[in-house]
Regions:
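Topology signature of small-to-medium multi-pass alpha-helical membrane proteins
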Residues: 2-176
Length: 176
């Protein structure tokens, strides 16, 4: 799928979700929407920094755990045992850390545009929400996921998308 086709698909999805949220019986009052728009850049900046810090901390923790497992196995073999400790840090763990880092970068990139009330910033939040949703579905198929994780991801994504689309009209598109 090329870049233009992907963009077309995302725009179509955005339009459908916007209509779906607008058709819901409960809409946020305009005053609440304006308050969210006012604080959104700062919330996004905080979450972006926190996400990058968490990704780094988890990456470092995973590396330390891997080294500890290797050391435990080496010591076990030296004293006549077998390597009994097994690292359970699969591709899913590393993928989760990478997704967290990418989301953090998206949030940081969104900050200036959100502050200027540009739709490009809103788009980055939308892409981050979609990335989180896709990651939640992928996690269904490994040891760290499961149906409970999928349900939590779907619920969190639905709530996040609801608020995101409630404020969508407050962001202006770039002039062509």
């Amino acid at each position: 799928m090329g870049g233009k086709e992907m963009s077309k698909q995302l725009n179509g999805l955005e339009t459908k979700l916007d209509k779906t949220v607008k058709d819901l019986p409960f809409q946020l009052p305009e005053k609440s929407r304006k308050a969210i728009v006012e604080y959104m850049p700062w919330i996004t900046l905080f979450i972006g920094v926190l996400s990058l810090w968490a990704a780094y901390a988890l990456w470092n923790l995973a590396r330390v755990a891997d080294r500890f497992i290797d050391l435990s196995n080496s010591l076990s073999k030296i004293y006549g045992g077998e390597g009994v400790a097994r690292g359970n840090l699969t591709l899913a763990v590393w993928l989760g850390i990478a997704v967290l880092a990418v989301e953090g970068v998206l949030y940081l990139l969104a900050f200036p545009a959100l502050k200027a009330k540009k739709k490009a910033g809103w788009n980055l939040l939308f892409y981050g929400a979609l990335l989180n949703l896709v990651h939640g579905v992928v996690m269904l198929f490994n040891d760290y996921g499961g149906v409970g994780r999928l349900f939590t991801t779907l619920l969190g994504s639905a709530i996040g998308m609801y608020f995101l689309f409630q404020i969508r009209s407050h962001y202006t598109a770039a002039k062509k």
